[in-house]
């Protein structure tokens, strides 16, 4: 890791903007100065870590940070998933009050089609990075997919034009009521815009054909699939990502195509007052190959090149002087790994896992399939997935033996088709047993649902989870009262009696463990990937936030805590909009002119939340089955409280276990 930007924290930008809307008498630049509101482009670098900004990989982003405002202590919304943070960007609020829990959550009873035109499976936990699934869920929830108003709706009501571009799911969520131009990996909306692109000679996302009746829109024969993702480079086993690969990153061509459409058509012809451009890099690349891998650096360079294209186009169109560009990530990103004493890092030679190399090796461990862990302990659990074959990421122990043995389904009766597997199928059955637990697997954090809300079963499940080393923090729905060793979901803004899960767990993490030069590892939902997020690790929680333009101070480093929940209120302040139900604040300390509020007006108070009492008398186990000497489980949530004018905002830094 190099660089010039490591000391520049990107986080406080969100705070200033959010405060502006929240504080009495706060209005946009247009109302306070009489000038035209600034155009705002929110450019989301999915999964971008602040410590990945460098002169070598991201010179354009580094330059923007140095000339504009940098937020040194920015916080992703927990859980640190893409769609949870997308909902915060959309509304300035948290998942509990919104009733939206992405990326996977359980919504039995919903129905409809997905972007591919096939029936969406809502019996199992549903994956929400799909515009059609989001429309299905909106209908299921009486057209209140998000239970608070959105920034895009406020902008459109005020007569402003909007554009949402990029990654399927989070881009669409910004404008899920479909009031402006939408162009994502699966569709182009509205119909007039889709036809406009066709007439101009641009190919449409291949699944756009499923958005409209065939008599309204059909794809040209040469349309191709411009937003299709490339294939992962694997080891010789055919399923595990080869962390040494150094080919073009899988999302790069699709990202470049969507940016081209934005720069060539949407920006000059539609001239949106508010844009969200959300692209997959470096997140998808980090998932597949890991943070610090050769592909990781290629992904950063590809994304930075697109930022350079955006800035050059704004200059060419004469828009640079009245456009605020905000660069933010939805979350940080960690490598998936278990404790080094159990699972040392390994070399990769010729597509195969080789000898131990704890100095510059790659992880071969850290995947947890919680449904399987619960089933082995006698619980009835389902996670909505079939058989999994994870030959490497399931873990090679120090002695060289696999943690999970490979088995074979010779006739396909168990897995649906013949083949090797390491864990069996846990699809949700048509008739769900009353004692069942349904798990929505989300990477670094899991949601557990108990349809009958059986308090005794919930307590027994919590007790089991507390006895496992791979569990870092446990939150429970308020209906279950005070369970030792847990905190209520409302303590981290995850309460929602109608839609929320019964148990929320963050997997354990190690913020100091280093792989390929980057700190941060965590246990995560089992898959053949090397990177993950979603946990309450400080690496996942602390993300990138930078801004430059006429609405922001130049060369300003904001030391105050800020969060993704502050982005929408900040943009609302810049555009003269009202978001009265937003829970974030306008980051006024970083704003320019009449909107600015000095740093001296704020007070920051670090504090800690802990369960009222620990869980005691436990028999603790590690992931390999060995015993821990500890017999009690507790955890601590570290946070900061920011105060100004009698108002308070809370920013969560991390939550981790304390075993005794």
Identify the function of each model-found stretch.
Residues 9-22:
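Bacterial N-terminal signal peptides
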Residues 51-104, 161-165:
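Short, structured active-site-proximal loop/turn typified by the sulfatase FGly-forming signature C/S-X-P-X-R
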Residues 79-81, 103-112, 116-140, 153, ...:
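Secreted, luminal/periplasmic, and some membrane-associated catalytic domains
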Residues 94, 100-290, 438-440, 444-451, ...:
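His/Asp/Glu-rich, glycine-adjacent segments
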Residues 248-277, 282-323, 335, 350-363, ...:
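A long, amphipathic alpha-helix that forms part
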Residues 469-503, 559-562, 566, 576-610:
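Polar, surface-exposed loop/tail segments
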Residues 519-548, 566:
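Low-complexity, glycine/alanine/valine/leucine- and proline-rich hydrophobic stretches
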Residues 597-660:
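Phosphate/adenylate-binding glycine loop and adjacent helical scaffold
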């Amino acid at each position: 890791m190099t660089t010039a930007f490591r000391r520049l924290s990107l986080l406080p930008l969100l705070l200033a903007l959010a405060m502006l809307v929240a504080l009495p008498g706060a209005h946009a630049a247009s109302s306070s100065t009489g000038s035209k509101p600034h155009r705002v482009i929110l450019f989301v670098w999915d999964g971008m870590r602040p410590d990945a900004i460098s002169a070598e990989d991201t010179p354009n982003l580094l330059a923007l940070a140095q000339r504009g405002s940098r937020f040194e202590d920015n916080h992703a919304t927990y859980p640190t998933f893409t769609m949870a943070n997308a909902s915060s960007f959309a509304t300035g609020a948290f998942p509990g009050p919104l009733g939206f829990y992405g990326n996977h959550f359980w919504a039995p009873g919903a129905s409809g089609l997905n972007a591919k035109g096939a029936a969406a499976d809502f019996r199992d936990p549903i994956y929400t990075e799909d515009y059609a699934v989001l429309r299905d869920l909106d209908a299921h929830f009486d057209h209140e997919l998000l239970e608070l108003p959105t920034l895009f709706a406020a902008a459109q009501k005020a007569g402003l034009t909007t554009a949402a571009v990029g990654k399927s799911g989070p881009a669409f969520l910004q404008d899920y009521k479909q009031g402006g131009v939408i162009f994502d990996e699966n569709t182009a909306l509205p119909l007039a815009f889709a036809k406009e692109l066709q007439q101009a000679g641009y190919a449409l996302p291949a699944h756009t054909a499923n958005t409209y009746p065939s008599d309204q829109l059909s794809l040209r024969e040469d349309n191709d699939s411009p937003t299709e993702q490339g294939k992962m480079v694997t080891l010789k086993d055919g399923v595990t990502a080869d962390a040494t690969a150094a080919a073009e990153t899988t999302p790069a061509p699709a990202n470049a195509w969507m940016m081209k459409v934005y720069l060539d058509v949407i920006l000059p012809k539609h001239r949106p007052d508010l844009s969200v451009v959300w692209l997959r890099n470096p997140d998808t690349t980090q998932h597949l190959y890991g943070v610090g891998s050769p592909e990781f650096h290629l992904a950063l360079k590809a994304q930075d090149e697109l930022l350079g294209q955006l800035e050059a186009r704004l200059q060419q169109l004469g828009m640079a002087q009245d456009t605020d560009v905000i660069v933010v990530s939805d979350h940080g990103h960690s490598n998936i790994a278990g404790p080094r004493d159990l699972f040392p890092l390994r070399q990769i030679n010729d597509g195969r896992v080789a000898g131990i190399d704890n100095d510059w090796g790659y992880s071969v461990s850290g995947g947890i399939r919680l449904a399987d862990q619960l089933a082995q302990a006698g619980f009835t659990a389902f996670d909505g997935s079939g058989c999994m074959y994870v030959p490497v990421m399931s873990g090679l122990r120090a002695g060289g033996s696999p943690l999970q043995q490979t088995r074979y389904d010779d006739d396909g009766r168990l897995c649906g088709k013949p083949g090797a597997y390491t864990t069996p199928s846990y699809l949700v059955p048509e008739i769900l047993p009353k004692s069942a637990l349904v798990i929505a697997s989300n990477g670094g954090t899991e949601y557990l649902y108990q349809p009958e809300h059986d308090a005794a079963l919930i307590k027994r499940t919590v007790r089991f989870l507390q006895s496992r080393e791979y569990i870092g923090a446990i939150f429970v729905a308020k209906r279950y009262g005070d369970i030792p060793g847990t905190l209520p979901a409302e303590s981290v803004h995850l309460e929602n009696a109608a839609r929320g899960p019964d148990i929320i767990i963050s997997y354990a993490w190690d913020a100091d463990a280093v792989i390929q030069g980057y700190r941060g590892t965590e246990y995560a939902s089992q898959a053949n990937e090397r990177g993950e997020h979603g946990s309450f690790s400080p690496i996942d929680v602390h993300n990138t936030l930078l801004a430059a333009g006429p609405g922001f101070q130049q060369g300003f480093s904001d030391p105050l805590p800020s969060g993704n929940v502050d982005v929408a209120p900040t943009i609302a302040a810049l555009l003269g909009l009202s978001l009265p139900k937003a829970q974030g604040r306008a980051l006024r300390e970083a704003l320019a002119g009449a909107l600015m509020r000095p740093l001296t007006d704020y007070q920051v108070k670090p504090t800690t939340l802990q369960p009222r009492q620990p869980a005691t008398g436990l028999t603790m186990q590690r992931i390999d089955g060995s015993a821990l000497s500890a017999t009690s489980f507790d955890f601590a949530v570290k946070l900061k409280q920011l105060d100004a004018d009698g108002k308070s905002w809370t920013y969560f830094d991390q939550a981790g276990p304390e075993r005794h």
